[in-house]
Each structure stands twice: as C-alpha cells, then as structure tokens.
Amino acid sequence: VLCAEGCIEEVRVVGWRDSAYLHCAARIPRSVHVAALVSPFDSLVWHRPRTEALFGVRFRLEIYTPAPQRIHGYYVLPFVFGDTIVARADLKADRAAGILRVPQLTWEPGVPPEAGEALERELDDLAGWLGLADVAGPGLR
C-alpha cells in the first residue's frame, strides 16, 4: 500500500537477498557524522539479521547468557561511529559510587584513532544523563 501511494519505494541493496524500502523524503548523505552508544533494544540493532547485513557485525545481547560464556559482557551497547559499529561497551551504573563503570570494552578491527575520544565523550554524556559523576574502566583516560 505504501509503495502504491508513493510514500516508500522498494530498493535493492547489494549483497542482500531481500528487498529494502526507502521513504520518499529520505536523502542519502555524502557521509555520515555520528557518534552514538545504541541501546541493545533500539530497532537499529534489535533485529539481528538486519544489523549483520547493515554493519557486518554479529551483535547479541548477553544478559541471559551464563557469565562464563559471554563474549562482550552482560549489558553491552554498540558504539556507532560514522556509519560503522566500531566498539561494544559493557556498562554498569554504580549509583552508590556515582560512577558509570565500563567492565569491558571491545574494539572492532581497523577503528580510526578519533573514535576513542568520541566514545569517551559519549560515555561522559551518558554518565551525566544518568546522574553519575564519573566514568571508569580499562582503557579509558
């Protein structure tokens, strides 16, 4: 119905088996400038096959995985830098200490150096939003 009404159009993406859809008002930017921690419940990463197709990264929420079998941590947020998932940060809000803890931080291969500073800014912003005073974890600051 939306295709027939001209609201969206069916498009083909190289390497994808299924069709994708593009909103008629969507504009494809020349480049993407974003740095964001993404909730594991965000629609961008919740649909795992689409996440793998878009980013070439296998993302799994490991909260129900027994601790010894976890790869990236308990509550992991992917970090998008530009148009790529470049890292995964396991986060824990330690409210008693006022610290956003990063027990584990995993970088994907080939990450540009400026991604580290961008991630630290995002972690600082998230800590502030949560009412926490600091961020602590291996490989930070």
Residue ranges and their predicted role:
Residues V1-R141:
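Long, charged, low-complexity, helical-prone intrinsically disordered regions
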